[in-house]
From Swiss-Prot:
It comes from Hyperthermus butylicus (strain DSM 5456 / JCM 9403 / PLM1-5). Involved in the binding of tRNA to the ribosomes. Keywords: Ribonucleoprotein, Ribosomal protein. Belongs to the universal ribosomal protein uS10 family. This is Small ribosomal subunit protein uS10. The gene is rps10.
Amino acid sequence: MVQKAEIKLWSTNVESLNQVVEQIKAIAKKTGVRMRGPIPLPTRRLIVPTLKLPHGEGSKKWDKWELRIHKRLVILDADERVIRQIMRVRVPEDVYIEIRLR
């Protein structure tokens, strides 16, 4: 039975996230490893309402600030040389990666 590697990526910047996913896809294609994904997972929206007026008197006016966290899942056959190449991929500061072997 072949071991699988689940690579979960998340970021607030969708362009840099897709860039890292494309690098992983290129590695999988170059080495001939079977790959599933990238599977887009649900985007998490964090909304923070803040009161515009500092003293709280008068009519209540609110600002809403939103942060979106985009997620992707890639599943690969866990070959040792492929995992080493993925570990060498340049990852921007705003992209987070979690690799789980199954």
